[in-house]
């Protein structure tokens, strides 16, 4: 699933929760709960966890001369993160007296050095072969390199560089892709070794690394390196063919041998991520795309890696990093020529976050597109995702038709005609030249797809274009027409606060900026301006019918908090502004200033927070936001503690919806549109899950975080496949609590917390096509499983508590492991208690009775009563679930 679809997903998830609501407003944390397509690779990370720190050296290439690539690299990476450059030696003309380079070869070397001077005139340089320029028979004859001439030619290049520039030469690759350019280079592993031996005898190379490998196909890199590894200080391969396994193995071998792992032609951020994982320490970008590579170079040098995942057969990888300044970013990448489409799931184990503005959620599933074969349908896709949280987050997803309003001037971005400059103008509702469709770019756009397309409403082929692909500050922006967007027409939205964004160009990394403070100023791109001028760089995306103004709504009043066992219900007084869009709910642990936005743009004046932990004390505040995206001051804070008192904290009766009948409002979300069917044990409907369609239910993040736990449900299996999951609460293959109806011979309950796993195998397995009442209790150091009210297995000495696992991915019908079969079954009346109920209680609930403190609706007298839902809305008659009848809880 690509990021372009996130807005649709958010709407779909909301609709799934509320579609059946004819009488209830379900304003709770559960309205944001997604149920994603099962991912190929799942990655978990803790925002505050200790990560892995690396010290890579990243560089840029001019072996294939392209000054634009270097300028893009400087702008996206920052000069401080460029530590090496790759130049090249040529062999188009014979050496004079076996030592003197021709003038045209020197001119090319001087050109490369001059380009590198834009980074630093002392930037370290590595040489490789420029075989595409052509070959002279003096160097190669009958596809066999003349070793002595070849070594002399390399020596002459190094000598010239040392004598005529300040660039230190730190390494030399004797050949470049010698496994492929056999005619041009005449190389072989043996000839590469012989060149290395000659260079090693030369005092000039005493402090210069000789690089081994240097193959196009990474399957061949190890053999090209191993035969001469006693002469090679560095090992290098390209990834233009070859398996993931041999790529990783090559860098692991270099690390084992104490050599420098080097990649002098990286084509995708995936190579950099994988290389770091297995031993690469020096990497050079062959060409330079844009943001993902630049931000990866920054954060990998000034941060810690929190998570890493890979799919070897599909040649893709992903990682999550935390910068030393606190920013967190996720990256996905692939092979340039061999990738297969892969779905990656990112899971935050500590708190709800926003992925490029999508949230508040714990997880995101992102599709990394691939092709249909080697160099077939490949897009060289890569991406970076901002992971954010806090008191002021992006107010919503940007995907629609807007006017772009400049903060400094209050004017909107516009154009007069194609080919002319982008300007600021006073907004006119009738001018479509001031209206823009802003949408995430397609994941098939080619290369980095971390950007947005901005198209004119008047003509969707007209976009905001940086003239001539300029990377210079104060370059002009123009309206330009073409069928598909180019890199100088795509933009990154960087949220700054109070509804404002920076817009940064994909090609240049520079900022869209009003040229002056005038209301009719031209629009340019610039570097970061001094703080006093930065309002010229800030923009809001506003609907066409919303006036731009900067008067914030009044701060909300009357905030109250009602604590329940596993949730906190907030209510507040309504604001009176006519242009009010909604409310933002903020939460922090009591005694901290670590506020996070846990709900956005609520239309009602109540919200039930069920992402809180039982027993912890929280502070809450509410802000108002208007249609112009102005945020109010926060309300006065109020504190509340979900009590954790023994109770049923959630119940799903599957009555054509996944509503929780308790006041905690822990509504579920389903993937695959499972059906509701007759033939039930409670109410009128049951939920049918199809294994072939990979259907499952996701329960809220904190539903199983108590020290003790009871899960009760009715289940009728439609398959006896071993190791299906009735439920599985956890977040990865090392943290789970699951129940399978059969491990092949018996019901199994298993818990794992890191390296510690505890299992309970029962005396029976569940049959197919029969309704069975199943209860699992965990507490007091004991786990018990009941079927139809009878104990079928127990184990004492249980030391793992559900709260130790801290499950956040709580599934009905699927497992944490990608290999676990999906459940084929009908499910009904799922209940969760935050304590271990007794054997007598099991009998009671199986028989339709209620536990202490809750009476049955069927026992209420048939006379008029005051009947309310948990939301306080009066009803004409009791409905399925919990009702408040004459002030008492009644379960129907």
Where are these predicted regions, by residue range?
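Lectin-like carbohydrate-binding module/patch detector with strong preference for beta-trefoil
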Residues: 392-551, 670, 694
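Short, aromatic/His-centered strand-loop micro-motif at the edge of beta-sheets
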Residues: 749-773
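Glycan-recognition/cleft segments
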Residues: 724-749
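Short surface loop/edge beta-strand patches of beta-sandwich-type extracellular domains
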Residues: 690-709, 759-765
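Flexible glycan-contacting loops in extracellular carbohydrate-active proteins
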Residues: 795-826
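Short, tryptophan-glycine- and acidic/Ser/Thr-enriched carbohydrate-recognition patches
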Residues: 422, 653-677
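Beta-strand-rich modules
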Residues: 609-630
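Substrate-binding cleft and catalytic face of glycoside hydrolase catalytic domains
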Residues: 63-218
């Amino acid at each position: 699933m690509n990021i372009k679809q996130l807005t649709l997903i958010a709407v779909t998830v909301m609709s799934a929760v509320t579609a059946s609501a004819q009488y209830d407003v379900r304003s709770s944390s559960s309205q944001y709960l997604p149920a994603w397509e099962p991912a190929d690779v799942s990655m978990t990370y803790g925002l505050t966890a200790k990560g892995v720190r690396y010290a890579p050296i990243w560089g840029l290439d001019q072996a294939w001369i392209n000054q634009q690539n270097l300028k893009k690299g400087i702008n996206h990476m920052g000069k401080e993160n460029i530590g090496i450059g790759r130049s090249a030696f040529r062999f188009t003309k014979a050496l004079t007296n076996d030592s003197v380079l021709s003038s045209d070869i020197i001119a090319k070397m001087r050109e490369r050095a001059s380009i590198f001077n834009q980074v630093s005139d002392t930037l370290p340089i590595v040489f490789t072969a420029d075989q595409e320029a052509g070959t002279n028979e003096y160097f190669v004859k009958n596809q066999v390199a003349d070793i002595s001439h070849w070594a002399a030619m390399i020596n002459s290049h190094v000598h010239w560089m040392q004598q005529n520039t300040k660039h230190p030469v730190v390494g030399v690759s004797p050949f470049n892709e010698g496994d492929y350019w056999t005619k041009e280079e005449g190389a072989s592993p043996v000839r590469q070794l012989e060149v290395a031996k000659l260079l090693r005898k030369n005092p000039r190379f005493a402090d210069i690394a000789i690089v081994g490998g240097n193959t196009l196909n990474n399957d061949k890199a190890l053999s090209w390196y191993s035969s001469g590894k006693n002469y090679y200080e560095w090992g290098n391969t390209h990834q233009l063919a070859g398996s993931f396994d041999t790529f990783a193995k090559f860098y692991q071998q270099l690390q084992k041998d104490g050599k420098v792992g080097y990649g002098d032609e990286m084509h995708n951020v995936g190579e950099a991520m994988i290389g770091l994982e297995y031993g690469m320490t020096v990497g050079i970008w062959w060409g330079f795309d844009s943001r993902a590579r630049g931000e990866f170079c920054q954060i990998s040098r000034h941060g810690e890696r929190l998570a890493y995942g890979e799919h070897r057969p599909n040649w893709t990888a992903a990682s999550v990093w935390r910068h030393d300044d606190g920013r967190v970013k996720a990256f996905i990448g692939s092979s340039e020529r061999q990738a297969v489409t892969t779905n990656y799931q990112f899971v935050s184990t500590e708190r709800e976050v926003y992925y490029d503005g999508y949230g508040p959620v714990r997880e995101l599933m992102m599709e990394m597109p691939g092709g249909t074969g080697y160099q077939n349908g490949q897009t060289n896709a890569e991406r970076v995702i901002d992971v954010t949280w806090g008191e002021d987050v992006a107010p919503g997803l940007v995907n629609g038709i807007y006017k772009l309003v400049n903060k400094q001037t209050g004017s909107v971005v516009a154009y007069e005609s194609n080919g002319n400059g982008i300007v600021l103008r006073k907004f006119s509702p009738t001018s479509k030249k001031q209206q823009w469709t802003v949408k995430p770019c397609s994941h098939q756009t080619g290369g980095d797809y971390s950007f947005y397309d901005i198209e004119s409403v008047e003509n969707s082929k007209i976009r905001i274009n940086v003239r001539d692909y300029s990377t210079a500050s104060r370059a002009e922006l123009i309206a330009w027409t073409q069928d598909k967007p180019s890199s100088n027409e795509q933009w990154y939205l960087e949220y700054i606060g109070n509804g404002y964004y920076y817009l940064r160009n994909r090609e240049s990394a520079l900022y869209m900026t009003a040229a002056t403070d005038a209301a009719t100023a031209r629009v340019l791109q610039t570097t970061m301006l001094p703080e006093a001028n930065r309002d010229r760089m800030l923009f809001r995306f506003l609907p066409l019918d919303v006036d731009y103004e900067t008067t914030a709504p009044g701060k909300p009043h009357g905030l109250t908090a009602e604590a329940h066992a596993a949730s906190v219900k907030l209510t507040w007084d309504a604001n009176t502004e006519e242009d009010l869009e909604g409310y933002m709910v903020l939460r922090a642990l009591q005694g901290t200033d670590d506020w996070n936005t846990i709900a956005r743009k609520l239309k009602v004046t109540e919200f039930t927070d069920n992402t809180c932990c039982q027993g912890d004390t929280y502070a809450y505040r509410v802000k108002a936001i208007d249609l112009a995206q102005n945020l109010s001051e926060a309300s006065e804070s109020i504190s509340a503690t979900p009590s954790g008192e023994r109770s049923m904290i959630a119940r799903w009766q599957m009555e054509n919806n996944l509503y929780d009948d308790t006041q905690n409002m822990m509504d579920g979300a389903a993937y695959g549109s499972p059906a509701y069917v007759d033939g039930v044990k409670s109410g009128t409907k049951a939920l049918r899950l199809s294994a072939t369609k990979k259907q499952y239910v996701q329960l809220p993040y904190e539903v199983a975080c108590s020290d003790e736990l009871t899960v009760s449900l009715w289940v009728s299996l439609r398959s006896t496949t071993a190791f299906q999951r009735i439920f599985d609460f956890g977040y990865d293959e090392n943290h789970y609590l699951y129940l399978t109806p059969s491990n092949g011979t018996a019901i199994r309950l298993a818990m794992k917390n890191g390296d510690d796993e505890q299992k309970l195998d029962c005396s029976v397995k569940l049959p197919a096509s029969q309704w069975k009442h199943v209860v699992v209790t965990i507490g007091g150091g004991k786990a018990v499983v009941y079927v139809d009210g009878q104990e079928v297995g127990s184990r004492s000495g249980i030391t793992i508590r559900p709260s130790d696992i801290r499950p956040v991915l709580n599934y009905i019908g699927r497992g944490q492991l990608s290999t676990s079969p999906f459940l084929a079954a009908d499910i009904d009346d799922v209940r969760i208690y935050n304590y271990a109920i007794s054997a007598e209680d099991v009998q009671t609930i199986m028989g339709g009775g209620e536990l202490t403190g809750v009476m049955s609706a069927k026992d209420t007298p048939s006379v008029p009563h005051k009947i309310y839902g948990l939301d306080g809305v009066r009803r004409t008659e009791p409905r399925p679930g919990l009702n408040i009848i004459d002030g008492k809880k009644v379960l129907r």
